[in-house]
Amino acid sequence: AGGKATCCPCFMCSYTAGCPWGQCAHHCGCD
């Protein structure tokens, strides 16, 4: 349960390379 603090901004989650730290996608509330 890391929460959204380790998540990248949703607009960066559309491409993995834009998000080298933390997590993306549905885990962070992105889709």
Swiss-Prot record:
Contains 4 disulfide bonds. It is found in: Secreted; Nematocyst. Pfam families: ATX_III (PF08098). Coiled coil: none annotated. Disulfide bonds: none annotated. GO terms for cellular component: extracellular region; nematocyst. GO terms for molecular function: sodium channel inhibitor activity; toxin activity. The keyword Oxidoreductase does not apply. Keywords: Disulfide bond, Ion channel impairing toxin, Nematocyst, Neurotoxin, Secreted, Toxin, Voltage-gated sodium channel impairing toxin. Belongs to the sea anemone short toxin (type III) family. Da I is found as a major form, whereas Da II is found as a minor form. This is Delta-actitoxin-Dar1b. It comes from Dofleinia armata (Armed anemone).
